[in-house]
Swiss-Prot record:
HAMAP family: ATP_synth_alpha_bact (MF_01346)
Role, per record: Produces ATP from ADP in the presence of a proton gradient across the membrane. The alpha chain is a regulatory subunit.
Keyword tags: ATP synthesis, ATP-binding, Cell inner membrane, Cell membrane, CF(1), Hydrogen ion transport, Ion transport, Membrane, Nucleotide-binding, Translocase, Transport
Transmembrane segments: none
Subunit structure: F-type ATPases have 2 components, CF(1) - the catalytic core - and CF(0) - the membrane proton channel. CF(1) has five subunits: alpha(3), beta(3), gamma(1), delta(1), epsilon(1). CF(0) has three main subunits: a(1), b(2) and c(9-12). The alpha and beta chains form an alternating ring which encloses part of the gamma chain. CF(1) is attached to CF(0) by a central stalk formed by the gamma and epsilon chains, while a peripheral stalk is formed by the delta and b chains.
Coiled coil start-end: none
Protein name (record): ATP synthase subunit alpha
Organism field: Bartonella bacilliformis (strain ATCC 35685 / KC583 / Herrer 020/F12,63)
A cellular component term, taken from the record's GO annotations: proton-transporting ATP synthase complex
């Protein structure tokens, strides 16, 4: 073996020359106590509020309480392997998550890690989860419809792009079903190759404290119906630690803001915020923050307001993007006056109130039209819908009032009887099976038939059959009429004449 001293000395000189004396510094602290997902850490004197820290076993946490002699850290994971005396390292970054189109069709946890077994995300961008909401200047008032495909909502409680509309009701009243149908209703806009990017709405579903089986079922329905391709699922299930349930809505919101700030449109459903409030209460009490009403901390209102204020419609100078929020709140025994429901009602731009009684009567979606309201109103409707839906809300309100009195008196005059008959048929018309969202122009035609007396002669049980037959006829023989309503966005006298002729002919032959 030939050893050349000159070569060896040359290599050694190179290595000595390139020797780097810089060491990697990181500020570390020690765990004083740990339990219930909270660690008290000593020694992290310069840590920021909301900064990520890493424990010696690789689990991450977030510094929430900055006290004189220690730091309260919430742990994003199991605290079983963390012991007193373990080292904790500052990571120097505030909590952030991956964002961008790479997340579409994926299921991620509250920190943006994939949990669907489909491999890494390869996202090119990251965003902080807790950022300031857009100010007044970049915003624009809500004026574009955000179609849900549900007649009861699109006609009576319209939602616009950039609005925050609360879905509130007891357990098992169909709150998640409304979110699911709204997601499915965006499918035609994504399938339409000729449609512009402005018509597409990307959907984000944040599951907070749900059963894993429920989330899996939601994902399965989206996948089967081809809606997962434009959706992101953020899941912090019931078995996840409270800090994960607390941060999941903020993470989902950051993912939606990516689309909003790039001139696109996104819709986010938080299911549900009452469980996030419970998780936040648990963390706050364990961090020894003073409790307030119902033992919630004093800043639980701020928790929800800063989250929901991030839903906005931006003006043209800022890209005209939008983020629409559909927060869900679960009530106990229809008590809307509890702490969290009243908080979120006061933050949002209206609420869709679902009632158990209506649900069991077979009125589904079980929307209480009297208590539900949209504070954006007809600004979020196309003119055609305004033309037909303007009278329906008043008629239904009168019907409910009369129906209450009619229980006591049997001899009713003809006009009252007519009002009750019309109301019963309109209520029947607003029923809609799950997974069958309707296009806006189809809703307009069916409601037009209802408010113009075409249902009055029918038995209430025939209303659904009449509607299905009418829509089948229009789709097969008169698609150009539906297309005209969709493109012109109003019912002109010419279209009205054609529609009346079709309805007259159909009603005459209907049996």
């Amino acid at each position: 073996m030939d050893i050349r001293p000159s070569e060896i000395s040359k290599i050694l000189k190179e290595q000595i020359k390139n020797f780097d004396q810089e060491a990697e510094f990181s500020e570390i602290g020690w765990v004083l106590s740990v339990g219930d997902g909270i660690a008290r850490v000593y020694g992290l004197d310069n840590v920021q509020a909301g900064e990520m820290v890493s424990f010696s076993n690789g689990v991450q946490g977030m510094a929430l309480n900055l006290e004189m002699d220690n730091v309260g850290v919430v742990i994003f994971g199991s605290d079983r392997d963390i012991r007193e005396g373990d080292t904790v390292k500052r990571l120097g970054s505030i909590v952030d998550v991956p964002v961008g189109p790479e997340l579409l069709g994926r299921v991620v946890d509250a920190l943006g890690n994939p949990i669907d077994g489909k491999g890494p995300l390869n996202a090119k961008n990251r965003r902080r989860v807790d950022v300031k909401a857009p100010g007044i200047i970049p915003r624009q008032s809500v004026h574009e419809p955000m179609s849900t495909g549900l007649k009861a909502i699109d006609a009576l409680i319209p939602i616009g792009r950039g609005q925050r509309e609360l879905v509130i009701g007891d357990r098992q009243t169909g709150k998640t079903a409304i979110l699911l149908d709204t997601f499915l209703n965006q499918k035609p806009f994504h399938e339409n190759e000729a449609g512009s990017d402005q018509d597409k709405v990307y959907c984000i579903y944040v599951a907070i404290g749900q059963k894993r089986s429920t989330v899996a079922q939601f994902v399965k329905v989206l996948e089967e119906r081809g809606a997962l391709d434009y959706s992101i699922i953020v899941a912090a299930t019931a078995s996840d630690p409270a800090p994960m349930q607390f941060i999941a809505p903020l993470a989902g919101c950051a993912m939606g803001e990516y689309f909003r700030d790039n001139g696109q449109h996104a819709l986010i459903g938080y299911d549900d915020l009452s469980k996030q409030a419970v998780a936040y209460r648990q963390m706050s009490l364990l961090l020894r923050r003073p409790p307030g009403r119902e033992a919630y901390p004093g800043d639980v209102f701020y928790l929800h307001s800063r989250l929901l204020e991030r839903a906005a419609k931006l003006n043209a100078d800022n890209g005209s993007g939008s983020l629409t929020a559909l927060p869900v709140i679960e009530t106990q025994a229809n008590d809307v006056s509890a702490y969290i429901p009243t908080n979120v009602i006061s933050i949002t731009d209206g609420q869709i109130f679902l009632e158990t009684n209506l649900f069991y009567q077979g009125i589904r979606p079980a929307v209480n039209v009297g208590l539900s309201v949209s504070r954006v109103g007809s600004a979020a409707q196309i003119k055609a819908m305004k033309q037909v839906a303007g009278s329906i809300k008043g008629e239904l309100a009168q019907y409910r009032e009369m129906a209450a009195f009619a229980q006591f008196g049997s001899d009713l005059d003809a006009s009252t009887q007519r009002l009750l008959n019309r109301g019963a048929r309109l209520t029947e018309l607003l029923k809609q099976p799950q997974f069958s969202p309707l296009k806006t122009e189809e809703q307009v035609v069916t409601i037009f038939a209802g408010v113009n007396g075409y249902l009055d002669a029918l038995a209430v049980s025939d209303v659904g059959r009449f509607e299905r037959g009418l829509l089948a006829l229009l789709r097969s023989d008169h698609q150009e009429l539906l297309n005209a309503i969709a493109s012109q966005k109003q019912i002109t006298d010419e279209l009205k004449g054609k529609l009346v002729a079709i309805l007259d002919r159909y009603a005459k032959n209907f049996s």
